């Protein structure tokens, strides 16, 4: 990124959003599709953070809503002037998940919440990502409904 004049945080974010190419580096063997994780996004955004003299901080907290627990992930982009842009995303912890203990369930919800906070901050569209739309064979055909 050329430094002709000082750019504000929104211009830096726009540069990052325009130049970020986050590949779908993970494979879901069950559904046989590729998807991107928070780690994939972080790996590709780091050089752009360096180029724009920005930093990224991601944090989690647990929110109780009714009898359910949600992980709230916050992604904050900060520049050298300490100007910030912040995005928050939530993921609900499953009540139980086969083969997972409580810590793994929370970790899984944290990963999803972080991914979606990063998606929001960096304008990554996952609507074509099977991880966001896969029903794992539970979809209903139109003729089944009629």
Task: Name the predicted role of every residue range.
Residues 1-146:
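Polyanion-binding surfaces on beta-sheet-dominated domains and ring/shell assemblies
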């Amino acid at each position: 990124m050329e430094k002709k004049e000082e750019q504000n945080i929104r211009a830096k974010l726009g540069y990052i959003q325009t130049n970020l190419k986050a590949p779908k580096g993970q494979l879901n063997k069950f559904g046989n599709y590729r998807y991107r994780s928070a780690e994939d996004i972080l790996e590709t955004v780091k050089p752009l953070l360096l180029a724009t003299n920005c930093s990224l901080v991601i944090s989690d907290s647990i929110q109780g809503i009714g009898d359910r627990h949600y992980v709230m992930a916050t992604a904050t982009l900060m520049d050298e002037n300490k100007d910030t842009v912040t995005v928050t995303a939530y993921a609900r912890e499953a009540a139980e998940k086969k083969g997972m203990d409580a810590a793994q369930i929370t970790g899984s919800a944290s990963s999803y919440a972080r991914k979606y906070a990063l998606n929001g901050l960096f304008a990554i569209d996952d609507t074509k990502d099977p991880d966001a739309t896969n029903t794992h064979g539970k979809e209903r055909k139109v003729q089944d409904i009629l």
